[in-house]
Amino acid sequence: MSSREIRIATRKSALALWQAEYVKARLQEAHPGLVVTLVPMVSRGDKLLDSPLSKIGGKGLFVKELETALLENQADIAVHSMKDVPMDFPEGLGLFCICEREDPRDAFVSNTYASLDELPEGSVVGTSSLRRQAQLLTRRPDLQIRFLRGNVNTRLAKLDAGEYDAIILAAAGLIRLGFEDRISSSISVDDSLPAGGQGAVGIECRSADIEIHALLAPLHHADTASRVTAERALNKHLNGGCQVPIACYAVLEGEQIWLRGLVGEPSGGLLLSAEARGPRASAAELGVQVADALLAQGADDILRAVYGEAGEE
């Protein structure tokens, strides 16, 4: 690879390709003349669509194949949804850029009802996320939560076919793919705390590729990175992945970060929450602090039970 060419490893889903094309456009805008090509591939998480993520188990379901491409020099960077990125990286790889965050909220999507509060008792709601399930059932224990996997188009098609009264998706994905008009309402973070990193795009590359790091620098968004650093530190301290009922969300208040964290039973029976404020420069330490507060309330018992159920399948 020359310094004027970058190969982007990406999943083949419409949203992943949008994110890769976004990074490509930003790179070429920042570096006129730079040649950028996409290397699409299929991840394990894309292949196993007949099971909930929590039952498949393991971390890095959507990134390992892309990381292999980096390690084998088949690509120079990999573009990820930050909520899918594991806390630890293979030796020789690292996260060197986080782009500006899109709307981090969850979106309520229905062809009949305008909001979660309007759903009649016993309505069927589709989601593949234990995090969303735990918060939904705490607020509305009468709802029937039904398994929903697949790409954004597939999920919308299942809703349109009448399989669900409503579905919950990340607002960012709908906005990026031009489906903003399908959002019946955005769910406040007070009612559905997002997943760590939700709405943010991250770029992974080889740690030794200094030229690549320099090319990525104009795409890095420091405010988003500070927020996501706090969220990921919480997740890491709880040993969380993208398929467990952990939520966390950080906002900047000047040079302070306000971080909220949550761990919930998938049944909605118990929802633990904690929050703290601290200096932006200590984002990672703040994540550990909030995670410790959750552990002190018994979060590890909830997470052990979830991992145990995944292991029994």
Swiss-Prot record:
Belongs to the HMBS family. It comes from the Bacteria. The lineage of its organism: Bacteria, Pseudomonadati, Pseudomonadota, Gammaproteobacteria, Pseudomonadales. Tetrapolymerization of the monopyrrole PBG into the hydroxymethylbilane pre-uroporphyrinogen in several discrete steps. PANTHER family: PORPHOBILINOGEN DEAMINASE. This is Porphobilinogen deaminase. It catalyses: 4 porphobilinogen + H2O = hydroxymethylbilane + 4 NH4(+). The modification S-(dipyrrolylmethanemethyl)cysteine is found at residue 242. It is an enzyme of class 2 (transferase). One of its GO terms (molecular function) is hydroxymethylbilane synthase activity. One of its GO terms (cellular component) is cytoplasm. CDD domains: PBP2_EcHMBS_like (cd13646). Binds 1 dipyrromethane group covalently. GO terms for biological process: protoporphyrinogen IX biosynthetic process. The porphobilinogen subunits are added to the dipyrromethane group. Pathway: Porphyrin-containing compound metabolism; protoporphyrin-IX biosynthesis; coproporphyrinogen-III from 5-aminolevulinate: step 2/4. Keywords: Porphyrin biosynthesis, Transferase. Monomer. Its cofactor is dipyrromethane. Its EC number is 2.5.1.61.
